[in-house]
UniProtKB/Swiss-Prot annotation:
The gene is nhaA. It is found in: Cell inner membrane. This is Na(+)/H(+) antiporter NhaA. Its main location: membrane. Na(+)/H(+) antiporter that extrudes sodium in exchange for external protons. It comes from Gluconobacter oxydans (strain 621H). GO terms for biological process: regulation of pH. Belongs to the NhaA Na(+)/H(+) (TC 2.A.33) antiporter family. It catalyses: Na(+)(in) + 2 H(+)(out) = Na(+)(out) + 2 H(+)(in). It is a multi-pass membrane protein. InterPro entries: Na/H_antiporter_dom_sf, NhaA. GO terms for molecular function: sodium:proton antiporter activity. It holds the Pfam family Na_H_antiport_1. PANTHER family: NA(+)_H(+) ANTIPORTER NHAA, SODIUM ION/PROTON ANTIPORTER NHAA-RELATED. The chain crosses the membrane at residues 23-43, 66-86, 101-121, 132-152, 161-181, 184-204, 219-239, 257-277, 297-317, 333-353, 363-383.
Length: 403
């Protein structure tokens, strides 16, 4: 009697293990936060997100409520996973040579500069909005990957790898921006502690120490020191990930084990919690014409216009100058469609918005801009790739610029 249900159960298991499943759960949790924030249970939702949770030994700058622990604590694991992914690609994947690194890196830099300039141009004359310039600079791989997988053969394996590498570089550049521009005032004794712990982690790597508790302990100490240093504490995930061994077969196995252990935690707990805690905002008083205000308009245009122009323009220019080559089986039309998808900014964009406009009335309009820009980028990118004529810029099977 239960046999007919076996295939369905198998499909569910595959879905839950896929990136699409994680993206769906993140979207579901985010929608739940938004719905609760605009329901009769809004007060309970706010009470939950601001529930006091403070440990005196962490000092004045330590997280003091549930939402802060998610953003400043658990999100450290997200940045750790980002670094682990790029390390795996560098060791044995699509970034294993300088030539392979160059193409997505150039696109990521272009996709960072142009959206930031677009935002600053739109918000010119609004000094209170200036700090949000970094909100539209990142691409969210959690949402772009399921879309390109759903498109099947319309996106070549080489183009898929390029987009994923670009999204990873985007996240890394976003981390650098957060560390440099969104920290607090510097406290030199804590910075010295950060340097010493980082040196110890590097020493452990150089000494080929494979004991994970050493890196885990170092990461926790680093996070604690970063709280008082003035740099953002999530930088601990970046530094710890960079210091994990990966130079030989045993190190690569260690890296794979850590990644396989932490990634599901980030996919199914950390990111959904982040979306649930940060997307919830009251829609009371919001009107469509509010999207024409400087902050949401700047973010929306930065994502849906600045991002594809920056990514596609920088990549195409580097190909024309013969600095890099297109991935095998990739056309310029396909490249443009993928550049449109790069405007899907969610996790990092929300993260930066919370830092840029913390305690400001601009946080809700900023989130509106993120949602609108990301949704429009997803729709335009999907439609372009789905309905683009197959004879538009025939792909080159060897890479390079199609002739």
């Amino acid at each position: 009697m239960t046999a007919p249900f076996v295939p369905a159960a198998a499909h569910v298991r595959r879905f839950l293990k896929s990136s699409a499943g994680g993206a769906f759960f993140l979207l579901l949790a985010s929608l739940a936060g938004f719905v609760l924030a605009n329901s009769p249970w809004a007060a309970g939702y706010r009470t939950l997100t601001t529930l006091p949770l403070k440990f005196p030994f962490l000092g004045k700058r330590g997280p003091d409520n549930v939402a802060a622990w998610v953003s400043d604590g658990l999100m450290t694991l997200f940045f750790l996973v980002v670094i682990l992914e790029i390390k795996k690609e560098i060791v044995s994947g699509h970034l294993s040579s300088l030539r392979r690194v160059a193409l997505p890196l150039i696109g990521a830099v272009g996709g960072m500069v142009v959206p930031a300039l677009t935002y600053l141009l739109v918000t010119w004359g609004h000094p209170e909005a200036t700090s949000g310039w970094a909100i539209p600079v990142a691409t969210d791989a959690a949402f772009t990957l399921p879309i390109i997988l759903a498109l099947g053969r319309r996106v070549s394996p080489g183009a898929r790898a390029w987009l994923m590498a670009l999204a990873i570089f985007d996240d890394v550049l976003g981390i650098v921006v957060i560390a440099l521009f969104y920290g607090g005032s510097m406290y030199w004794p804590a910075l010295l502690a950060v340097v010493l712990v980082t040196a110890a982690l590097i020493g452990a790597n150089r000494g080929r120490i494979r004991t994970l508790w050493a890196y885990g302990t170092g990461g926790i100490l680093l996070w604690t020191a970063l709280l008082d240093s003035g740099l953002h504490p999530t930088l601990a995930g970046v530094i710890t990930g960079l210091c994990l061994p990966a130079g030989d077969a045993k190190g690569a196995a260690t890296l794979d084990w850590v990644s396989s252990a932490v990634t599901p935690l980030v996919t199914w707990i950390v990111l959904p919690l982040f979306g649930f805690m940060n997307v919830g905002m009251s829609a009371a008083g919001m009107k469509p014409d509010m999207m024409l205000e400087a902050v949401p308009l700047g973010i929306m245009l930065g994502l849906m216009l600045g991002k594809p122009v920056g990514v596609f323009g920088a990549t195409l220019l580097s190909i024309r100058l013969k600095v890099v080559m297109l991935p095998a089986g990739t056309s310029t039309g396909m490249l443009f469609g993928l550049s449109l998808l790069c405007g899907i900014g969610f996790t990092i964009s929300l993260f930066v918005a919370n830092l840029a406009f913390s305690g400001s009335d601009l946080i809700a309009p900023a989130k509106m801009g993120i949602f609108a820009g990301s949704a429009l980028s997803a729709l335009t990118g999907w439609f372009w790739l789905r309905f683009m004529p197959q004879n538009v810029t025939r792909p080159s099977e060897e890479g390079g610029f199609p002739r």
